[in-house]
Amino acid sequence: MAGPLIVLAGCEDGTYLVEVGASADEDQLAGRQPGAAVERERPLGLAPAWAAGRVLDVDARGSTVVLLLDRRPPLVVSHDGGVTWTERGAGLPPGRAVALGEHPDHVLYAARNRLHVSGDGGVFWRALAIELPEIHDVAWG
């Protein structure tokens, strides 16, 4: 394995970052030393309001992770593999968030019947002009 594989697990008491090791003995909650005791209250290191949100989708490339949450603002971004997080998406419209689309240079966000694209990790967003029927999922072609 080239680097740690990070899995985000939405659980009853929050969202957990889990590092998948080369073997079961090496699996751990992200940021923990191997063999350290696992504490139940290790949700992502996010503020309590963020941890209360349910993760709807994830876009992860290298050390950058974008989470789509079921709350406002709908996005949180980490550029250090989940150690620190920043709220993003304040300019996105209210309403039900649907999905994120992965791309090496852009983040795609879908809400109801409109797509929004960001080329800077979610700081600024541009709504695409076309209006679609209700969107259920997105992917780059």
Segments predicted by a language model, with ranges:
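Extracellular glycan-interacting surfaces
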Residues: M1-G141
